[in-house]
């Protein structure tokens, strides 16, 4: 009988869980605040979110969005909390899912490719905390905004995340909503290719 990997191989230390949950709560809170301000068009928080809100509310807009799952999900709660709040919460939840999925796969890879189970408890705690910090670093660094005419790692990323109205790196809710699925596809493709 095959063991459930979540119950055995992917167990994390208490300190690792607490660190992850604390940072997840903090990160999600900050992202929800950002998306909320964007959806309610608070000055200083310009983004494309008003167009997403209009789509959720059923108002015809100037843009076609290629990713309907985001809007279907937002509409589930829009009747209860309104289109603006629903869009903010839905975007934050997809972002939260992406972090959790990344943490799961990073834990899986670390445990598969290292000798985690034979490490001392202290080293396991440090490994769990480092993996958690790497996950959040990936999410924050993946949205870097580079000023115009500058190169980052030798590539010109001028206005890489410009969006329609703003250099806000979290402007594109469609991109944020696809990340959980893209992360799963990435890790599962790596798994298939490594076993092929």
Label each PLM-derived region with a short phrase:
Residues 32-48, 144-150:
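Helix-to-loop transition at the C-terminal end of transmembrane segments
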């Amino acid at each position: 009988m095959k063991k459930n990997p979540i119950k055995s191989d992917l167990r994390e230390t208490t300190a690792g869980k607490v660190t992850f949950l604390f940072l997840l709560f903090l990160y999600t809170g900050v992202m929800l605040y950002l998306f909320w301000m964007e959806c309610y068009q608070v000055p200083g928080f310009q983004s494309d979110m008003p167009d997403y809100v209009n789509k959720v509310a059923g108002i015809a807009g100037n843009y076609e969005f290629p990713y309907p799952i985001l809007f279907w999900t937002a509409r589930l709660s829009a009747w209860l909390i309104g289109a603006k709040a629903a869009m903010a919460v839905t975007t934050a939840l997809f972002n939260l899912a992406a972090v959790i999925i990344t943490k799961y796969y990073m834990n899986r890879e670390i445990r598969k490719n290292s000798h985690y189970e034979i490490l001392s408890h202290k080293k396991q705690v440090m490994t769990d905390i480092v993996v958690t910090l790497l996950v959040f670093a990936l999410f924050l660094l993946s949205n870097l905004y580079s000023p115009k005419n500058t190169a980052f790692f030798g590539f010109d990323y001028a206005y890489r995340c410009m969006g329609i109205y703003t250099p806000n790196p979290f402007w594109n809710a469609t991109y944020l909503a696809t990340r959980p699925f893209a992360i799963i596809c990435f890790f599962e493709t790596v798994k298939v290719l490594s076993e092929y």
